[in-house]
A protein has these predicted regions:
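Active-site metal-binding loops of divalent metal-dependent hydrolases
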Residues: 14, 50-51, 88-89, 145, ...
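Extended substrate/RNA-proximal surfaces in nucleic-acid metabolism proteins
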Residues: 57-169
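An N-terminally biased module of ancient metal coordination in phosphate/nucleic-acid-related enzymes
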Residues: 1-80
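Metallo-beta-lactamase
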Residues: 15-24, 155-160, 170-173
Length: 173
């Protein structure tokens, strides 16, 4: 008899951290989100509050404190789920300077960065920005690529970005 394999997933793009930008307003909603994630087989969640210069700019120290408190509160809710902190970076021309100055924009101190673009981004801009980020030594994770018109018009472009070394993230729901 064959043994069934249980697959577990990692959610690398989550606004589960309550009280921060797109996150829930309260801990009760975060707890419910954790339970749903667990039921769906997720065993690691990277909380990725937005980083958008001039808009979503909560300081890193405050964000880290909020995250550590959240992590402590969630310990008894779903102890099997590992929590990590990252950011969802809205790409602008200033981001390269910010990346150079602030390593805390990565996913849990790794070389991976989650990058979001405007839905009508031009493919040439998207490609150039990915190349620039990679030249700095980071691995770009392109957030919700299914939202970008240039890619919707030609899905081969997503493969081209992947072949450059970018990671492609799509929303599941």
């Amino acid at each position: 008899m064959r043994k069934l394999t249980t697959f577990h997933y990692v959610d690398i793009h989550s606004h589960i951290l309550y009280g921060v930008d797109d996150g829930p307003d309260n801990i009760e909603t975060s707890i419910e989100m954790m339970k749903i994630a667990y039921d769906e087989g997720i065993r690691k969640i990277v909380a990725t509050p937005h980083y958008h210069p001039g808009k979503c700019t909560m300081g890193y120290e405050q964000l880290r404190r909020n995250f550590e408190l959240f992590k402590e509160q969630m310990k008894d809710v779903c102890p099997e789920i590992e929590l990590a902190l990252g950011r969802e970076i809205y790409y602008t021309s200033d981001i390269l300077d910010d990346l150079e100055a602030q390593a805390h924009l990565t996913m849990e101190d790794s070389k991976y960065i989650l990058i979001e673009y405007h839905p009508t981004v031009e493919y040439s801009y998207l490609r150039t920005s990915i190349s620039n980020v990679m030249q700095m030594g980071y691995t770009p994770v392109i957030a919700h690529i299914e939202r970008y018109m240039c890619v919707l018009e030609d899905w081969k472009l997503a493969l081209e970005l992947k072949n450059m070394g970018a990671v492609i993230q799509v929303n599941a729901g």
